[in-house]
Amino acid sequence: MDTQHFDGVLVIGGGLAGLSAALAAAPRRVRLVSPAPLGEACSSSWAQGGVAAALSPEDSPALHAADTVAAGAGLVDPGRAALLAAEGPGAVRRLASFGAPFDRDRQGDFLLSREAAHGRARVARVGGDRAGQAIMAAVIGRVRRSAHVEVLEGWRLSGL
């Protein structure tokens, strides 16, 4: 068994959450450990549909949060729904800045669809229904270009 010592930020997992944590830790040194090549041992790459966020002038995080709480039939914490809805537009724009090829209209704005219990068109899609794969490819590319992140693929941890 190989023992390694590291005094930076350790991120375990190569899905969207792990990749996002590695990027957010900048400028601290990060070691990201994944049991498989990035994006292959996670469910993030399989996600379909799109990302819901209040991105249009006719929408707002408050409206998005209200729709989420109503659709949750009593199971959604209103405070957490409000936080996620408030952070959503920035998160989608950040993913787009990483290169996620969200569908756009002729003016370059996000092409949004209205789905499920959403009261407004707020689902930003990628190539119709390939959001997970395309978003992961963009975020993986950003991680690989980040000098502060060391990626260890095909590794397993047996203890901390």
Where do the protein language model's features map onto the residues?
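N-terminal Rossmann-like FAD-binding beta1-loop-alpha1 element of flavoenzymes
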Residues: G8-L32
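Conserved N-terminal/central alpha/beta ligand/cofactor-binding core
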Residues: P35-G159
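A short, basic/flexible loop-to-alpha-helix module at the beginning of a structural domain
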Residues: M1-F6
